[in-house]
């Protein structure tokens, strides 16, 4: 996926720049989210990969499936289809979303937990993490049973590992060195 990220970056930046000019950042985020979801559906993904379907047909099908009304977003889909890049739409969406968060001075955080967290626990963690990272955070929670217990938090390239697995790994490293 690193290759997709590299390919998607200039598209996401260009689209975001245009969205800023047109004051359409949030509405285009919603459109991109729908496009990214549709492209990942099995039947649509196989249609995109089909060489016998021309680029304009692929673009039209996607535009119709999502119900895009915005002229610039339609043109964006047409450009991607013409360059055989429709499969990178999920990565374009992810990077556009990151640009939107950064523009709004919000960071994205992922809390990994061995067990499901209650809304109250997530709220308390959010307060602590907002202070710790001195920023407003958009938090998502993912369950990873292999953590054994505790949590691991990723904010950008920073990782805060408070899991049992992380502590056992640190103990193992200490004992073997």
Curated annotation (Swiss-Prot):
The keyword Iron is annotated on this UniProt entry: no
PROSITE patterns listed in its UniProt record: ATPASE_DELTA (PS00389)
Assembly and oligomerization: F-type ATPases have 2 components, F(1) - the catalytic core - and F(0) - the membrane proton channel. F(1) has five subunits: alpha(3), beta(3), gamma(1), delta(1), epsilon(1). F(0) has three main subunits: a(1), b(2) and c(10-14). The alpha and beta chains form an alternating ring which encloses part of the gamma chain. F(1) is attached to F(0) by a central stalk formed by the gamma and epsilon chains, while a peripheral stalk is formed by the delta and b chains.
Recorded family membership: Belongs to the ATPase delta chain family.
Annotated source species: Neisseria meningitidis serogroup C (strain 053442)
Pfam families: OSCP
Its membrane topology: Peripheral membrane protein
Protein name (database record): ATP synthase subunit delta
